[in-house]
Amino acid sequence: DELNKKVDSDETISDDGVVAHGASMDEKHDYMDNGVRHVHNGRTRRKGSEHEVDGRFTPMEARLVFHLTTPPCTESVLWVVQKDDDEHHTRREEGPHWHDTHSFKHAEDLDVHLTPEDDLEDDKRHDDTYTYEGSLTTEEVQVEGYKDEPEELEMVDNWRPAQKNKVTVYKASEH
């Protein structure tokens, strides 16, 4: 579900009552060191959920792996690995909308790590392979992150007209 309604500083809630808790995505992170976030989300009043975070029961857990390009660009690629009703769902989200509109905080259980693999297909440019080793409630899963499109070069508009050499122009002050 699209989370689009901010409740307070540590949770985000959608129109149908799904709440997400996790780490802050309001700042730029380094790709290898800080590019993974562990988020719990679900209906806060639902008892018997698989997770309890800060006294709240949450039925779904998600792992977000994102890549922020060179600052000041905020374009990101997110891999979402979540467990709901004993099934794994993997979804890829691209674009700056997650980075700009979501605020997740208080996630310390960052147990997803990046594992580069050498035997991936050579005809695609891969960023890395993301491996989650599993927990008591979630089986291990591995997702290969690919980008089919080439990296775009940013052009800077720094053109200016030719300047005259050794010429100083003085203008009279009106005051």
Curated annotation (Swiss-Prot):
Inhibited by diamox. Zn(2+) binds at H38, H40. Substrate binds at T137, T138. Reversible hydration of carbon dioxide. Also acts as a structural protein, having a role in calcium carbonate crystal formation in the bio-calcification process. Residues 1-52, 85-104, 115-175 are annotated as: Disordered. Residues 24-36, 115-129 have a biased composition (Basic and acidic residues). The keyword Repeat does not apply. It comes from Lobophytum crassum. The keyword Electron transport does not apply. One of its GO terms (molecular function) is metal ion binding. Its cofactor is Zn(2+). InterPro entries: CA_dom_sf. This is Carbonic anhydrase. Its EC number is 4.2.1.1. Sclerites. Belongs to the alpha-carbonic anhydrase family. Glycosylated.
